[in-house]
Structures are given as C-alpha cells and as structure tokens.
C-alpha cells in the first residue's frame, strides 16, 4: 500500500534546486522518511536524475552511526560527488549529528548539491540555527495523515474510516495493521520507547516519572484551558509531588519541540490581544493521545476538536482559541459580565474564520451555547460550526455556517462555503 502525500511532494517539487536547504520537520514516524526516500526519490528518478546522483543517508540507523560525526559525514558526501552534474542529498533525522548546521552550511557552498534534510525536533529551527543558515533554510512541516489522506488509503467506507481515525489516529504505520490489538500495542510502544525516550535523552531529564505524569495530565485535558500552576496543583493534590511551575513549563516546551503536542494561545477577540494564562494543548495525533490513556478516555467532542485543530494546521492556518466578553443576564435576571469561548480563531493572511466544534447540535440548549459566542463577536468574518456526521453545509438565518465533519475534512476549501 502506497500512501499518497501529494501536497507535501508538490512542495518539494516546487522548492527543488532553489539554492536553499529544504528542512522537512515533524514528529517521528509521521512519514518524513517515506516522503523523502520513496516518493521524492521516485520523482527524481522519473525526472531523469541518475540513481548514483542521489545520496541517501539515514542517521537514525545503526549502519550510519559513524556518519553522525560531522567531519566524517561531510567527507563521505564530498567523496560521493564525482562530477559537475547536480547531486541530490537526502539526509534523514539530522538531529542525530552534532554540529550538523556547520555541515549543512559547508554543503551550501558546493553549487551542484541540492540538500534535503529531515528532523524530528523543532529546536534545530531556532533563531540561532536560522542565523547560521543566513536565510537559506526552507522549512516544510509534515504532519501525521490528515483524515483525507487516511480515508484515501483505508479499505472501507467513511463511517468505518472515521471510527478508526478517532481511535487510532493517522500515523501511517497504523494502516498496515489489520488487527486492533496490533494498532493499540504499536501506538503504546512507540509513545514510550520512541517519543518519551527521545525527549528524556535529548533534554537529559533525570526524573522520567515527572514527564510521564505530565503527558498523562495533558492527554486527559485536551481542549481544556490549563497552565503550569494548575498542573502543579494537580501533582500536589493527586500525586503528592512538588513539581515547580518553571519545570512544568520547560517540560511542556520539550514536548512541543518534539512535535508531540501543540499549544494554542488564547486570543481576546474584542480586546484584540493575547491573554497569557490558560492555553490549550492538543496532540499532534489523537491515536497517540488515546494510546497514552490506554484507550480509556474516549471523549468524542474533545477528540473531534483535536482533529479539527490539526486539520487547520495542516492547511496552513494560524490557529488560536478565542474568548469574547459580553454582558448577559443570569438565571436571576441580573445583568453580569460573561466570558464566551470560541473554539478556534483561524487566520491566514487577511482572512479570518471563527469555528466551533460540536459533537451533537440537536438540543436547543447546545445550539444556544455554540451560537451565543458568535452573536457577541463584533465583526463580520465567517462563523462556522463543525458538527459530527455527514451533514452538507448550510447557512442559518443569522448567517452562521453549519457543516458536517465529513464535508469539512474531505474538502480542502471547506471554509470557503
């Protein structure tokens, strides 16, 4: 089974021979190596590039352990370049090499090498590295399979695919297993033995239990506003552990750098400013989140919200969570100031969308809850509610768009309805 990653492959084609280092980033096992060594290499060969002019090095493999030494790697690449024709270097998991930025900068000075690297940690895209590359690094962010990519490779109908995706997520390897137990064991195993191990080793953490518990807390609270103080209090009350705010904040940063989670800032829509406290955290793959909790906490609304968030990132949007303050009457008829939440404030260029995610909108109370946030937003940008199911999009009398998850996920331009 060959899974298509057409959008990412197209980016590589466009950026080919542009004189910059193409840096492919994303969580481990999301398909970066497959994109580079299979799909892009196939494209190069079909374009007439000779096989001996494609240099492939996977630094996470034991067979290339020696090449993790920067000088040896640079020398090896130099020796492979035997003529003046264009060579294509495909370098996988570059963070395994110390001082890799020096090697890449040296390769930039060789005019007939076009360089492509992958990495599973965002630290190597820090401002220091960007300065080292002097504006000659070109990032392509890769995500686990979108639902559209998953569905295209899935052997079954939409309902079965959606159920699978909500439980086991979109890591490509999951599609290779036919037995549910295998999928679950695979996800639980790589979470502990790949992702957590990487975070612990890369950041030289001594207390593995702390990071383990932190991940469990974040997995239990996807879509819920939180902050280091709240998490610290949870550690004290439930575990009897003193875990400082600063340490928690650092550990969350490590998880973000490893692409395991993303954080969504809170934006005050009326005040037009960011609110520092109570961010929301989402997992880069819901299957990993579910595996971390042993598939116990199956909360469809929060899982749907996580999937919508990831889909928006895949489409290239900037995504925040919104709050809007307004005056409203309470149950006693008194007017009080109330804070309404908007699941996502979505921006791209001059475009903005407000999005609510609801598993069920059949009750009048639920409709009121979702629509009241929109009613208090003082602008005319599009307001969309994404609901579970296959409902085709329609616009109600207030101008709000309601669309089913199927339409949202399978139509790349669904926000333009």
Where are these regions (language model features)?
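Pre-Walker A adenine-sensing motif
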Residues: 2-19
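Conserved glycine(s) of the Walker
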Residues: 31
